[in-house]
Structures are given as C-alpha cells and as structure tokens.
C-alpha cells in the first residue's frame, strides 16, 4: 500500500507542476480560449481527484 501512496503522491506533485505552468499560459493566450477551457476544467478535475486519492491513501497508510 505504501508503494501505491508514493506513486499517487508523485503523480500529484508532477501534475501540480504541469498545472502551475499550463494554467497561466492558457489564460494568457486569448485566441485559443475555446480550446483551452475544456482542458483547464479537465486538468482541474484530475488534480482534485488526485488530492482526494492521496488523502485517502494517506489515511490508510498511516
């Protein structure tokens, strides 16, 4: 179970770095807003799910 927690935590950290770079770039480019908006919503949803998964795994591991 500890390995699954570590993989989920690493995925959350890496995805957070991607979002830190990607979200400002998406907001700064108005010409692609129609195409960027669904990707932002999808990315935000994936990030929120990863946070919940890491929290649940942390509860089970500790």
Curated annotation (Swiss-Prot):
Pfam families tied to this protein:
Ycf9
> Taxonomically, what lineage is the organism?
Bacteria, Bacillati, Cyanobacteriota, Cyanophyceae, Synechococcales
- Function (record text): May control the interaction of photosystem II (PSII) cores with the light-harvesting antenna, regulates electron flow through the 2 photosystem reaction centers. PSII is a light-driven water plastoquinone oxidoreductase, using light energy to abstract electrons from H(2)O, generating a proton gradient subsequently used for ATP formation.
The gene from which this protein is expressed is psbZ
Keyword Cell inner membrane appears in the UniProt entry? no
Could you tell me what this protein is called? Answer: Photosystem II reaction center protein Z
User: In a knockout, what does one observe?
Assistant: Grows slightly slower than wild-type under photoautotrophic conditions (40 umol photons/m(2)/s), grows less well under low light (7 umol photons/m(2)/s). Does not grow under photomixotrophic conditions (low light on glucose). PSII is normal, oxygen evolving capacity increases, the PSII:PSI ratio decreases slightly.
Q: Where found?
A: Cellular thylakoid membrane
Membrane topology designation: Multi-pass membrane protein
Q: Quote the InterPro entries the UniProt record gives.
A: PSII_PsbZ, PSII_PsbZ_sf
Main location class: membrane
């Amino acid at each position: 179970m500890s390995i699954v927690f570590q993989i989920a935590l690493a995925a959350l950290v890496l995805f957070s770095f991607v979002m830190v770079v990607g979200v400002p770039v998406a907001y700064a480019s108005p010409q692609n807003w129609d195409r960027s908006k669904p990707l932002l919503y999808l990315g935000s949803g994936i990030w929120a799910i990863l946070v919940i998964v890491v929290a649940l795994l942390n509860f089970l591991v500790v």
